[in-house]
């Protein structure tokens, strides 16, 4: 007969495994979507814009700087220090490092038009699955996934609405930054826009 301790240990292990898989899936999906030529995913569009404007720092580094600001914003909204948010930042750091790892090898993939479409579809589905896994694992998750979930709880608005709004704001910021500073919009494509307006519901269906 299983004890409560054994059941708790199994639950924690499953949560940890789900989180590891989610981080690996999301980091690959973000780079794959960008490689497809359809644009960067909304959750990484702001760090991507900073990388293009200030290329001395990698996408991964800009990502955890952005994530730190999201964590700080949540603590300000909560009006207190939340230890689990700090844990989330360390998970985000691992995600950021994996972005740079995946960016280093992704060019080995062939880049025909049919394959680009396939890469986008795969990356879209992977992000939906990855975020749904993160939300259900019961452990600290990547700050870009944590932010809309926590904001939804703080201001009492449905998660899917917050997620779509967050993505659209990220895309608007990216468009303004690259358009005004570089003279042309970088990183935003039809896939980015489609994902931003539908991914909230996609995650809800997947989760």
Predicted regions and their residues:
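Core subunits and conserved enzymes of cellular information-processing
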Residues: 2-207
């Amino acid at each position: 007969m299983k004890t409560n301790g054994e059941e708790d240990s199994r639950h924690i292990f499953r949560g940890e495994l789900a989180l590891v898989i989610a981080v690996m899936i999301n980091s690959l999906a973000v780079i794959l979507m960008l490689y497809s030529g359809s644009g960067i995913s909304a959750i990484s569009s702001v760090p991507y814009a900073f990388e293009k404007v200030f290329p001395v720092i990698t996408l991964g580094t800009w990502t955890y700087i952005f994530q730190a600001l999201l964590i700080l914003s949540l603590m300000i909204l909560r009006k207190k220090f939340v230890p689990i948010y700090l844990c989330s930042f360390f998970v985000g750091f691992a995600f950021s490092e994996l972005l740079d790892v995946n960016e280093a090898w992704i060019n080995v993939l062939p880049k025909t038009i049919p394959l680009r479409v396939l890469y986008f579809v795969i990356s879209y589905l992977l992000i939906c699955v990855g975020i749904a896994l993160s939300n259900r694992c019961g452990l600290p998750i990547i700050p870009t996934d944590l932010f809309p979930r926590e904001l939804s709880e703080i201001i009492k608005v449905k998660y899917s609405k917050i997620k779509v709004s967050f993505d659209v704001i990220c895309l608007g910021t990216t468009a303004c930054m690259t358009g005004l500073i570089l003279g042309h919009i970088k990183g935003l494509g039809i896939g980015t826009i489609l994902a931003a307006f539908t991914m909230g519901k996609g995650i809800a269906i997947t989760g």
